[in-house]
């Protein structure tokens, strides 16, 4: 949205010339500025030669809009900080954002962002709080929002933002609950949802929501189950799905959902397995697929599927590797790529992807760095980016990528 002389507003939807509704008298002053930056998609617009005296029709005002780069954020548990980077769309290289690292509460354990990229939320297990930040769309700088940090339960573990951007959910391991918050979409503030917290199994850890936002799933690592809930789209309240909780392998510690919303993948650290479940689109109930479980060995920590849904990846913390798979989008089955797994740093935990699906980023907790890889578009194989190792703080563990 443009404006002239701080009052005459004009919406622009395409390239080309534009004319404001209110004329400027000959010799009068004009001052064209950006009133509102575009949001779908997010762009950063600037005006060149936007002011002067109108001696005739003004034709030299130029508005230039560019998409901001994606940003990557990783929490550092020992340092109580978030390391922040811009992602180069062409090369996948990371560059530290000015002001990084940014302070969090004590022992940050996870970070999540809303789908619009406006807000980020850090679960602080040590201080029992959730730190909330606004994200500068142009620079990626994090700024604490008013009221942050927000109270959470004992040992808050993992958090996630609902696909609508209206709700935030966090597992609280000691209390055996998942806490739900409504997000003020204007300022990012959190308010507990009526009925929150909601009961889980024993020691809930990771959490996932299907892309439609209808169902939420929590892994319970002490009783080896998955709690499944229907999400009220209006209030954010959770209701257990019939048949929940569903059994899984020993010490389920990671969970992800296919971009199609058809399958759930759960990593069981003590078994060295990944369990695959089909989601009933009507009820949210889980059914083990014919190919489940698949054995990975080496203590699988994170399971992730790249954008597009064709390739899956499992971080093996003991072996210091990432295993790559092709994904059958019809059955959900994983088929491991031929050849050895991809080497990483020490104790790879989290893995994330740029929005295009061209690059993967692995957090190496004991190496205190992030390793960047090209994803082969045909096979899904990971190839290390030259010079693509980037320092973060101590005990970095959770990564989120923001952008489009």
PLM segments and residue spans:
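Surface-exposed interfaces of beta-sheet-rich extracellular modules
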Residues: 1, 17-52
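Secretory-pathway extracellular proteins and peptide precursors enriched for disulfide-bonded cysteines
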Residues: 34-39, 56-58, 325, 373
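Conserved "repeat-terminator" motif of extracellular CCP/Sushi domains
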Residues: 34, 53-68
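Short loop/turn and low-complexity linker motifs enriched in small/turn-promoting residues
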Residues: 1-3, 59
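Predominantly soluble domains enriched in secretory-pathway, periplasmic, or organellar proteins
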Residues: 66-404
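Short, acidic Ser/Thr/Gly-rich low-complexity loop/linker segments typical of extracellular
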Residues: 7-17
